[in-house]
Amino acid sequence: MASPKSSTRPNQENQEPQFQDFFPTMAGKLGGEGLIEEICKGFELLMDKDKGVITFESLRRNASTVLGLGDLTDDDVRYMINEGDFDRDGALNQMEFCVLMFRLSPELMEASRCVVTEVIEEEFYRH
């Protein structure tokens, strides 16, 4: 998972948490499927076991105990949930979490864009 640099508190300049991006290294070592498996394991660590989604409460609790991010404010936690909550149900399902993790990694997003472009070009030129 993306890892906080020194704090996840928004900085004054852009008001977004800053993260150190370990995904490209993980992808290189684990491969695509291995990376997805690790992201899914991260989801399981943070989710509410009864509801099967990451809720405000489960993220607040598990970010502190599992990830050691005890200095997160309620606003930090809300921001993290809202950033990936596409269906606006107030929680992150596994797909939303995986998409969010990829969105937080500019290098992986660029690599994905290149792969999609190659596939489209191959299909276009084959027909």
UniProtKB/Swiss-Prot annotation:
Ranges for region Disordered: 1-20
Residues the record lists as binding Ca(2+): D85, D87, D89, E96
One GO biological process term: cellular response to hypoxia
A Pfam family that the UniProt record links to this protein: EF-hand_8
Induction comment: By auxin.
GO molecular function, one term: calcium ion binding
SUPFAM superfamilies: EF-hand (SSF47473)
Known partners and oligomeric status: Interacts with PID.
Protein function: Potential calcium sensor that binds calcium in vitro.
Name the UniProt record assigns to this protein: Calcium-binding protein PBP1
